[in-house]
Curated annotation (Swiss-Prot):
Keywords from the UniProt entry: Cell membrane, Disulfide bond, G-protein coupled receptor, Glycoprotein, Membrane, Olfaction, Receptor, Sensory transduction, Transducer, Transmembrane, Transmembrane helix
Source organism: Rattus norvegicus (Rat)
Family: Belongs to the G-protein coupled receptor 1 family.
Residues of this chain annotated as glycosylated in UniProt: N5
Protein name per its UniProtKB record: Olfactory receptor-like protein I9
Amino acid sequence: MTRRNQTAISQFFLLGLPFPPEYQHLFYALFLAMYLTTLLGNLIIIILILLDSHLHTPMYLFLSNLSFADLCFSSVTMPKLLQNMQSQVPSIPYAGCLAQIYFFLFFGDLGNFLLVAMAYDRYVAICFPLHYMSIMSPKLCVSLVVLSWVLTTFHAMLHTLLMARLSFCEDSVIPHYFCDMSTLLKVACSDTHDNELAIFILGGPIVVLPFLLIIVSYARIVSSIFKVPSSQSIHKAFSTCGSHLSVVSLFYGTVIGLYLCPSANNSTVKETVMSLMYTMVTPMLNPFIYSLRNRDIKDALEKIMCKKQIPSFL
């Protein structure tokens, strides 16, 4: 019966967000504003880095790729969510669901690896400033970016192919606002052991190890700065690491809690809210925390704005 159901299924029904109907328009406006902010913030970063030659450095190479990953990561789920919030029967085609899983994993993993590269870049810049250019050579930076893209491609493809092997009952209802992998496993009609094993085995090198490397990098940064005891050095340590670590902890904390350490007590509402944190909030905050507060980015933006204003006075 599962084989018949698997071939017959053409779409999934999404329950969406657990909000009262009377607040639907309010949350629609809120999520639309958040999505547009995410698009605008990340597009500004990418354009500025492309146009300003002074930003053609290792750190901004990683930043531009991270902005692209965040922009696409948010676009994987947000447009469909906004569309379904205006639909009487929120659904997603079977092929669209698999595509959403693939790109969700791809851009999520890509941002994950880029955060590690950025943490390492800051570590070298602060702890080994005299050797920064020799260590962070263009060849190494490009290699790190290419490696990130390659690893994410294979990881996302593996999980997508494993999901495609599963059988689903007709009229399958997903208690989520997108095709979340862990939620799909709960509604599958066939054995999900291989999928769960792949998540557990690959979760370490893909999620936990990068998180630990980021923590170690920032810990070394703080330790290096504290070797020169002064109020200025302490302020520099917190300004350099505090805001970055808060977003990193928010992203990794929710991902690890949802996928690597799932609890039987986790309700659908709790899982949905946790998912909102890393699918909406983190991509929106990253441009402000990593780039828009940066003096180089502000200078580049001011130069472009001045160039556009000068012809109007001529």
